[in-house]
Amino acid sequence: KECDLKPEEIVAKIKDAGVVGMGGACFPTHVKLSPPPGCKAECVIINAVECEPYLTADHRLMLEKADEILVGVTILMKAVNVTKGYIGIENNKPDAIKLMTEKAAQYPNIEIVPLKVQYPQGGEKQLIDAVIRRQVPAPPAIPINVGAVVQNVGTAYAVYEAVQKNKPLFERVVTVTGKSVKNPSNFLTRMGTPMSQLIDAAGGLPEDTGKVIGGGPMMGKALLNTEVPICKGSSGVLLMNDKEASRAAESPCIRCAKCVSVCPMGLEPFLLATLSAKQDWERVEKEDVMSCIECGSCQFTCPSHRYLLDYIRLGKGTVGGIIRARNAKK
């Protein structure tokens, strides 16, 4: 049925249900739906790109819950008082694009936008640029500064369940996969479930497992053991074999600039990594480390196998703390 709640009532319900960004950041959804003074939303963009290799949780969700997702989108649009919604889906999901386009025919204000297969197309700023051709300035600017409210497709479904069913967010779809996994699957999983249970359900831990990754191969993080619980931002569990998990030794930078050419934010990863290693935090901040989206493209393409993302994450975390401390004194 159609949602007859007022925008503020919708936001309150979403807050009470504990709905957060399901793409991994876990940013509270009710905060995104409450623009700061002076900012006005013009559209809602649903991120259904799922550009990380191996992960298929959002893809599966669209194939099985298309109607519910579209209702969730209309609720999000009503919450921020806009009349236009977009759902961005990469072209490598033709079945999802076809189904969502057919289902969206009854929603004239919602447009399905097929997107080029390109990592990291699912980055918030990259998605906004691809869908509405607007560029979000450097931090502290956020999507609402260009009139966009971006939500993950899983969040749209969670919003539907929260508002229409009064159901809090206590479960999500999680991909369990890997080249050696016997039965790669997507599981509807309750928060707090140990990853070991999901691995068992997918056929057990392969003997040649070299690493267990929480998330995808590009932006995920290696886990110490399989007893780590599933949380709201857990999109997948990736089991890498010994060969995939092996890490080449670092070599000196050869100044090829490949990391610069692939950076979606136009940064200089080689410089940020070098400055972070030297702990030159003032320069690291000046070189705009906070704009890094940690996509890992630089490290993936580096012929010298430099641990660029590791150093940049160190720099970003340190500079972020310095900025917060500085702002607290004001």
Question: Where are each of the predicted segments found?
Answer:
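Ferredoxin-type iron-sulfur electron-transfer modules in oxidoreductases and energy-metabolism complexes
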Residues: 234-250, 260, 264-330
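Short, solvent-exposed coil/turn elements at secondary-structure transition points
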Residues: 116-118, 218, 242-243, 278
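Iron-sulfur-cluster electron-transfer modules
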Residues: 1-130, 255, 289-290, 294-299, ...
